[in-house]
Amino acid sequence: MKSVSLLKLVTILILMAGMTHASDEKPPNILFIFTDDHALNAISAYGGPLAKVAPTPHLDRIAKEGMLFKHCLVSNSICAPSRAVVLTGKYSHLNGQLTNKDMFDGSQQTVSKLLKKAGYQTAIVGKWHLKSTPTGFDHFEVLKGQGQYYNPLLFTNGKNVKHTGYTTDIITDQSLKWLETRNADKPFFLMTQHKAPHGRWEPALRHLEVFEDMEIPEPPTLFDNYAGRTTAPAQHKMGIADHMGPHRLMFQYSSKFTPEQFKIFDGHFRSRNEAFEKLNLQGKARTRWNYQRYIKNYLRCVKAVDENVGRLLEYLDDNGLANNTVVIYSSDQGFWLGEHGWFDKRWMYEESLHTPLIVRWPGQIQPDTTNTDLVSNLDFAQTFLDIAGTKQPGDMQGLALTPLLRGKTPANWRKTHYYHYYEAGGHGVPVHYGVTDGRHKLIRFPDDTLDAWEFFDLKKDPNEMQSRYGDPQYTRTIAALKEELNRLRKQYQVENFENP
């Protein structure tokens, strides 16, 4: 009997020791690095046409040490609404942020509030772009409005603080300062949110000469004439040929430079602009020049982002935080890099719909893996909460990505994705909504002046040049997608909702 009792005592002590050890383990830190308008094709880990000419080694490192998602789709491809989706885990019609013009309701439930309640120290540094004051954060330093690329104002502690330097560097500087001064006894949730590579694309002084002596490859659809689809895409106002204007092409500047900065920046562009004007280029030659000026400045802005991602990763390494910090890199949406002759986003077409998502989670993710499931920015909030080990509210509409991160896609994972864009008239893009299963895509333009559908077979037509809506060979597929579209609108509580 004594030996049995002794065995029981030893067993209890072992279990208690295990429980004590488990309770001593901190939940993982979460570092969410979020950029603005970062196209998949501008991250070399995605292997696109720009991968060799514009490598992104630090972003590629996250992919090499973690998981790259090939099909992360946004729910509403425009800046402020996408940010609201990330914070709330709800579609735009439920979180109230339909367009860039709306003010975010900070009184509602957000992931930052829930993580703070769960014991996390929370901070956001960089681009906010939601008009209201951030809530749910122990610390915030956010750009005023859209922000500028040089010498930004950061709003914190009730006042705007002027900083001198390049904004991408400064956002990282301030993120690192917060990491240095945070309460090290608590896990942290840090949202480092860059303005870059949003237009108007003003590179760092150190990058002005990068790509200078090369021709960046043109996309095959640069001179799209928009035939084969509804009239909607032809009504755009985001053409590289006609709509970039002097600020986007660096004939005028948006930032307020110091005299020293202006001398270097203007010194680079002025002589090149004068040489261009003497050429008097017209037609396709002018479009090609515009494209080279645009894409080089865009990629220069991305280069600064990549360097600063490297600074954050280095800090985690040097301070023993890398093994217990989940690093998540994404953007508010994709972006046009000349495809269909465009810049900007908004459309449900592929380059705008897809956003990058790369995650590193040591000990949980098999390094250098790729996921091809349909995931969404709608999933981010619940993923943060699940990583933290805290409850996911039932009114959130996404799915936690943690099973996928561990390499085990649930059998009932989503097979389709619902999209809805509301900001009518922005860059000439009409209200539209739709559904995709990754192979096929159905888009509805409900406006009275259009009242039209588009349907694409993405396997046969990956560039979405020819709508096959009405084609008899796709009758069953289109009918099934319409049924699925109606089901999703009911599931997401939008069945009776149209643009106001």
Per-region residue spans from a language model:
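Bacterial N-terminal signal peptides that target proteins for export
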Residues: 1-10
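Formylglycine-dependent sulfatase
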Residues: 2, 14, 18-453, 462-500
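Residues forming the ATP-binding cleft of Hanks-type serine/threonine protein kinase domains
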Residues: 459
